[in-house]
A protein has these predicted regions:
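Short, extreme N-terminal segment that most often corresponds to the first beta-strand
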Residues: 1-29
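Acidic, proline/glycine-rich low-complexity IDRs
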Residues: 89-135
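Amphipathic alpha-helical interaction segments
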Residues: 50-51, 78, 89, 95
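Amphipathic alpha-helical interaction modules
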Residues: 19-76
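Intrinsically disordered, low-complexity segments enriched in small/polar residues
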Residues: 1-2, 40, 46, 57, ...
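Intrinsic disorder/low-structure terminal segments
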Residues: 2-3, 8, 48, 57, ...
């Protein structure tokens, strides 16, 4: 199976891995970078994705194992990626370069899996292709 992860070059403090797209845009909200309208849209989008994309249970505990999530390159995973237009637009507007890491091997030890994604600990990035996300 193929897996992909969309992220920035910024390394997250907790995971010590590149920060993912959801957290990146969340940080724009936290820093009050977005306009009021964009912030309102962010909360609308976030509510939607929390409804349609399962939230791995370890997030309720603050992600104690420092897991990172990867989308499965399946119709379900691609559908979620295609719906992330707002997130991509905010990154572009605020000058944040997004990267897409892709691998055909498990990118670490899987601790969670659903139809859309996997979550891994102890990431192994030796067979990952990284490219810049185009619009």
């Amino acid at each position: 199976m193929k897996y992909f992860r969309v992220h920035t070059s910024d390394v997250a403090w907790l995971t010590k891995q590149p920060r993912g797209i959801f957290t990146t845009v969340g940080k724009l909200v936290d820093s009050k970078t977005l306009t009021e309208e964009e912030t309102a849209e962010y909360w609308k989008q976030r509510e939607y994705f929390e409804r349609v994309l399962p939230v791995p249970p370890f997030y309720k505990d603050g992600n104690p194992d420092h897991a990172i999530t990867w989308f499965k390159d399946t119709p379900q995973g691609q559908d979620i990626w295609n719906q992330l237009t707002f997130y991509r637009q905010m990154c572009k507007k605020y000058g944040i370069t997004l990267y897409k890491s892709e691998t055909t091997t498990l990118p670490g030890q899987v601790i969670y899996e659903d139809d859309f994604q996997i979550a891994v600990i102890n990431p192994s990035n030796y067979q990952v292709l990284v490219s810049t996300v185009k619009d």
